[in-house]
Amino acid sequence: MKFPSFLSLGIAASTTALAALPDQKPIGDTIADVHLGKFLIELAPGDTRWVTEEEKWGLKRDGRKFFDITAEVEQNLFPRAFAKTAVTFPTDLHRTVEVMPLAAQLSKDNMFSHLTTFTSFHTRYYKSETGIQSATWLMKQIQKTISSSPASNARVEKFEHPWGQFSIIATVPGQSNKTVVIGAHQDSINMFLPSILAAPGADDDGSGTVTILEAFRVLLQSEAIAQGNATNTVEFHWYSAEEGGLLGSQAVFSKYKQDNKDIRAMLQQDMTGYSKGTLDAGELESVGVITDFVDEGLTEFIKKVVNGYCDIPFVLTECGYACSDHASASRFGYPSAFVIESKFEHSSQHIHTGQDTIETLDFNHMLQHAKMTLGLAYELAFADI
């Protein structure tokens, strides 16, 4: 996600702390460096440049967002040539009778417990050893969630990447191959020294990670979902390397496009836990529905989901080009949407630093995101889309 407007750590303070921190030796380079160690990034449609890795972090420190499209060059992919999947979304909610009792099972305690452990890894930087360890821990929690549910056909798999940390995909088969995707990114980063300094990443995006995990747990408690009677298949994704330029999600959706996978909708949950910025601004607590670079029809339906299943309203906000993993789905022609914790300008200023800790989060607010996620997943699982 974005970089905070203030630089509270300070380079001098960061350097002083280095000796006390564990060694985070990078696993290896990302995708092959075809330009002498540089990477091709896209900051806006058609605005590309070759940069070093340090220049990537410098851009992010300045609040610039981008795709790292080096892999497209290597694989001769041309995403803009892909036809956009045309989907007509429902005009109203049809599953409130089933969803409301499920939503009552969502647990703040579960999210707190999972996030406490998830933020205890020194960093979840995608090229670090602890980034692999955190992904391994997360995958075990997802497998436990499946094993303790009645959904015997549900499964979880690694999606491997060359940089170390893998993405994770959990699948709940339905009656068709039409697929609804719920996503979050599991990696974290400290923008001062990514491979060395602590990056608890509680809000960005530990909050989204545990929010969709809790929605996944409760979704599997539905007898109709567990028995595979939903009209559509539902997948939950936890992406690696979002902070490096949406690398993990691009790899996933590129593979899906090459495999002709029928993705009908994708919702991203990135930063779901910070409400203080909104309240400090004297505004009502709300969730932020992103309106730029998203699918209009899916976004309109999400507004109905928030109104129907959440206890707080939505506000409309923008986050810019390539601002989270939903942009990768859009890039490869799939309808996508993004809901964040607030208006973009009121979102957490602690991210990408060592201060992005669990103490800054509001788990009641995260529960609202979990309700929205569960409601959307269930509604679209049974929708004719």
UniProtKB/Swiss-Prot annotation:
Record EC number: 3.4.11.-
Functional summary from the UniProt entry: Extracellular aminopeptidase that allows assimilation of proteinaceous substrates.
Gene Ontology molecular functions: aminopeptidase activity; metal ion binding; metalloexopeptidase activity
Family annotation (InterPro entries): M28_fam, Peptidase_M28
Protein name per UniProt: Leucine aminopeptidase 1
Pfam families in alphabetical order: Peptidase_M28
A cellular component annotation (GO) from this entry: extracellular region
Chain residues that bind Zn(2+) 2: 204, 243, 352
Native source species: Blastomyces gilchristii (strain SLH14081) (Blastomyces dermatitidis)
SUPFAM superfamilies: Zn-dependent exopeptidases
ATP-binding in keyword set: no
Cofactor dependency: Zn(2+)
Residue ranges of the propeptide: 20-87
Keyword list, A-Z: Aminopeptidase, Disulfide bond, Glycoprotein, Hydrolase, Metal-binding, Protease, Secreted, Signal, Zinc, Zymogen
Cofactor mode of binding and number, as noted: Binds 2 Zn(2+) ions per subunit.
Gene3D superfamilies, A to Z: Zn peptidases (3.40.630.10)
Domain of life: Eukaryota
Secretion signal span: 1-19
Quaternary assembly: Monomer.
Family per similarity comment: Belongs to the peptidase M28 family. M28E subfamily.
Disulfide linkage: 319-323
Localization, UniProt: Secreted
